[in-house]
Amino acid sequence: MLTLDKIYHAKFVLKQVARKTDLIAATRLCPGTDLYLKTENLQVTGSFKVRGAYYKISQLSAEERAKGVIACSAGNHAQGVALAATRMGIKSVVCMPDGAPIMKVESTKRLGAEVELVKGTYDDAHDRAVELQEQTGMTFIHPYDDELVIAGQGTIGLEILDQLPDVDAVIVPIGGGGLISGVAFAIKSLRPEVKIYGVQAAGAPSMEHAFHDHKYETLDSAVTFADGIVVKTPGETTFDMVSQYVDEIVTVSEDEIAAAILALMENQKLVAEGAGATPVAAALFGKLPLAGKKTVCLISGGNIDVNILSRVITRGLVMSGRKTNLMIALEDKPGQLSLVSDIVSACGANVVSVHHDRSDANMAITSCFLKLGLETRDAAQIETIKQKLTEAGFKLVTERA
């Protein structure tokens, strides 16, 4: 049974490996909201996961340590297990889905773990890890549905109360539920009036469904670029704790997560992975009642794969009205492009790409489609450009991001 004493013990044990991450005021992120960021993206291994993994492994018996540990993970828990096991001189094996970010796979190997890539999702990697555990007798280090792991994650709750004693609300990402279970238990045990909100990706809302349906259930599929929270089945222990200690769970879209990542980079100079940005997405897009509340967004990790970061930034620019593509029907005669360019320039936008299309079957023989890629200030400027083009007699055929 999880107790507050166990979380305090985890805090003592973790002093030798995990850092007390900064809690910073997000003064430029969400005007009108008293927002703070708990920067677990700056934690050892770039994620909160080292807390639970290290505390769990530290409590193993000598016999268990001799046999080694095994885990399954999309990346962050893998790195936490690898680091903890290596520091204690214990063999570690980690099963990871084959779609896990290359950066996380390679980092796990560098930290000393033996990695086995498993075709499919996290759940498939979990099944393989359980199979290997039964064959080898190694201790399975569950990423979230384990009391000691939850206790380790709960140390973040103690730190938040220490760093911001008058906090009113905390927003926490949810995958399997280990992080929010520990944080909620710690905070509610000491300050029961503090609101604890959870956030999931709309494409992987396993705990959100279970929470609102009041029953433990499994999704048919879970798809999101926020790989750290792609879980089809929440934990049984965590579901019970979330049902008891969490006040509300909401979901955010892929575009909203991308916009939050961009906002954190531009306004706070912080790099967050998809999962870590979900609390900020919930705040930015008004998913929760935060007015008048001192609110902490828990940035759970910063291990985003650079191969997808550029796409995420592009999506974030589109969501924030900083980038758009327009398609305009033109008469195919000299001077038309110049007229369009003058209008765009007068509105203060920047043309970054131009393409003429004379082959579309839907256009008149004497016409062409002009496709423009624009850099803009915001959504209002985009609307002004459209209005000016329409007033000048140009027809906007379609618009694509």
Predicted regions and their residues:
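PLP-dependent amino-acid enzyme catalytic core
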Residues: 1-401
